[in-house]
């Protein structure tokens, strides 16, 4: 799987790649990467639970970027903990809700690249390993939500002593109520009352689980949509009493 002809080593960090194209990303624009550009990192978010769909999240020590790939079951070859080099030359970088993404062109915006294109641009390094430092979440407090720079999203985070606003023993994470809504938003509340949106796909394998009540420890990917922070859970198991 992948392309073993891709050269060793990165040419740029993920944070610097996002900075280089910051104006394109923040304008929800699109630009092809036309020079030698390689990033190296570890997958910190895959599609196993169904909450992340046709995307992978890859991290190095500097940050995380979203990769759009028009395939499902990506976790079979690219699970959390898989290290890789990505040859970005020829791919497109752009913004969706001002969140940086690598992919190809879809209706004039950045979209998911075909699976065969992904395989040409990725080289897997070793076996998956859950001990990479990139897989350790940063502690997120209520104060961080106003001080952290949204341009750094996604960020792998952990929160302590938060609770779901609507948890009543019956409310589900993402009940499919018909219609066109493919995701449901719930609020996580910090002890000081600060709220954070948790957005869950109705296709997630935990969508029909009851929202846990009481004080929780929660890990997830802190992302953005425009000027709003939102949390994506990688699995239902990352919400602990």
Q: Which residues does each predicted region cover?
A:
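OB-fold nucleic-acid-binding modules
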Residues: 1-53, 57-83, 87-241
């Amino acid at each position: 799987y992948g392309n073993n002809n891709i050269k060793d080593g990165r040419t740029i960090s993920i944070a610097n790649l996002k900075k280089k194209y910051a104006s394109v990303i923040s304008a929800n624009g699109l630009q092809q990467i036309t020079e030698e550009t390689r990033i190296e990192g570890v997958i910190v978010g895959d599609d196993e639970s169904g909450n992340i769909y046709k995307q992978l999240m890859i991290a190095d020590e500097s940050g995380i970027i979203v990769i759009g790939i028009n395939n499902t079951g990506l976790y079979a070859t690219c699970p959390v903990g898989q290290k890789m080099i990505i040859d970005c030359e020829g791919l497109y970088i752009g913004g969706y809700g001002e969140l940086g993404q690598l992919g190809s062109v879809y209706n004039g915006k950045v979209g998911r690249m075909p699976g065969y294109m992904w395989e040409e641009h990725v080289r897997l390094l070793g076996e998956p390993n859950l001990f990479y430092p990139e897989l350790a979440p940063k502690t997120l407090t209520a104060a961080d939500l106003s001080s952290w720079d949204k341009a750094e999203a996604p960020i792998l985070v952990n929160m302590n002593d938060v609770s779901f606003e609507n948890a009543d023993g019956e409310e589900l994470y993402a009940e499919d109520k018909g219609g066109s809504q493919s995701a449901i938003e719930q609020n996580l509340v910090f002890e000081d009352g600060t709220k954070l949106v948790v957005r869950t796909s109705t296709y997630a394998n935990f969508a029909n689980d009851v929202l846990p009540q009481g004080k929780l420890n929660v890990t997830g990917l802190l992302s953005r949509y425009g000027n709003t922070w939102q949390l994506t859970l990688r699995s239902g198991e990352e919400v602990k009493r």
